[in-house]
Amino acid sequence: VIHEHRVLNPATEELVATVPATTAEEVAVAVTRAAAAQRTWAALAPADRARLLRRFAVLVDEHAERLARLEVTEAGHTLGNARWEAANVRDLLDYAAGGVERLTGRQIPVPGGIDVTFLEPLGVVGVIAPWNFPLPIAAWGAAPALAAGNAVLLKPAETTPLTALRLARLALDAGLPEHLFQVLPGSGDVAGNALVEHPGVAKVVFTGSTRVGKQIMARCAQRVKRLTLELGGKSPNIVFADVDIEAAAAAAPMSFLDNAGQDCCARTRILVQRSVYDRFLEHLVPAVASVAVGDPSDERTQMGPLISRAQLERVRTLVPEDADGIRGSAPGGPGFWFPPTVLTGIAPDAPVATEEVFGPVAVVLPFEDEDDAVRLANATEYGLAGSIWTRDVGRALRVSRAVRAGNLSVNSHSAVRYWTPFGGYRQSGLGRELGPDALAAFTETKNVFIGTEA
């Protein structure tokens, strides 16, 4: 039995903290306390709940630099990214607070009376956050769930619990009821399973691998428990010949090197029309070489380390040592470093071209025409994100509709905004997070008919 988890700085391998591991018994106690706090929270006037969430957002803003530095230390994120993530949490809390007083039902015309619907909170929601974006993704589940009147039990990843613990402290300082937002550090096998299987938890929100997501889905099925799953990805970056090839090549590296490639939206399959394939690669070489890899606390750094030695070994295993391609540089010495890598001459069905590597690795594959591009783009089990580079508006719309993925960008690699929906097709998940309907995903619809005929 693991009683505590060691948090390491992935850039230095130094011990940052040891955090007690939550037991199954402690999860059960937390659920009971959360249920009581949720009743108090749901009974508050909507304006009061919104005010407290806005206060929470203000405190996150005041502590943004400390949160960002924690994210750098425990997750290896670059300082620029970590600052964006802290701001994203602040903005999402504000956005969710704005929805509290707008979470309305409907009046539906019926004969013989009045029919109305109510959106009621589920109760206690379990949020299982990943290690790749521990701070913002924790808020993606927690903020709308709280805004809809629920309590939240957040289980962070074993390697990255520190920002979650700080968020819970800020929630208390903001005046949210005690036990309404609790953080339960621990292993997936113990704390995670206890959260998923507890009958008092009405919904589970999980972000992580497709393999673990399937296990959670099976456990939720035993109790017909609601769930949202944001899982893996192997997203395409489709470059047509009519686009500015130099601009497309310059934009490509950070579409898969952001967070050292540990991003489910990473555009790790670069599909380039054959007529411009060689020219694209010529421009891609200097673009990859120019990416600054190093100390994530340095404001000039664009890419930091992988999260752990285990992740480093997984990436090494999936990347063929003798493959042709483009390789950037990475620091030697301590830390979990892997250089930016672009592979060419890879078969479209090779593991590195179809499986989620979750590292700074992409493959470049040629395609002939629009139909061939769509076929290649859809030739994985995933469907989370993708980019389409073209000057032809008609083609952009046709390909956007034909690619089986939930989040597509044209002439851009943007995938996540807190005010637009986010989620995947196929093996990339179930449900949507963020956006204008985020709060409704944490409610039940109740229909009430009131007869008016004597």
Residues of each region from the PLM?
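N-terminal Rossmann-like NAD(P)+-binding subdomain of aldehyde/semialdehyde dehydrogenases
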Residues: 1-113
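Conserved C-terminal structural/oligomerization subdomain of aldehyde/semialdehyde dehydrogenase
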Residues: 12-18, 201, 238, 292, ...
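Short, well-ordered beta-strand elements within core beta-sheets of diverse protein domains
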Residues: 16-22, 37-43, 127, 237-240, ...
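Residue-level signal for inorganic ion chemistry
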Residues: 13, 34, 49, 71, ...
